[in-house]
Swiss-Prot record:
The active site is at H20 (proton donor). One of its GO terms (biological process) is D-ribose catabolic process. Homodecamer. This is D-ribose pyranase 1. The gene is rbsD1. It is an enzyme of class 5 (isomerase).
Amino acid sequence: MKRGGIVNAQLAGALARLGHTDTLVVCDAGLPIPHGPEVVDLAFRLGIPGFGPVLEGILEELVVEEAVAAREVEGANPDCHALLASRLPELKLVPHWELKLRAADARLVVRTGEATPYSNVILRCGVPF
């Protein structure tokens, strides 16, 4: 058994398969999930698991060179915006409709049980060197 980190086998494997410039979406329970990407659905009940803990776990595993969230998060969900801004200095904000369009090009979608508005982010993988 792993000592720590992500112990969900499907999620750990999906993250390990990501390469430089691949994108993944970490989303709330309400974001429409496109049909193309691999999906790891972690949602159990509304609010469980939350967006923050899932994002934090993923950020411990990945190098991120760009992050994109919906501009609407600033006003509708200031706690989520604060988390994103503090953990992702490369964060760019775009209209929510654009975020949904970009999500269709992701290689992986990780759905959480989060039930607050605009708790979504697209991460583009970087390299550790």
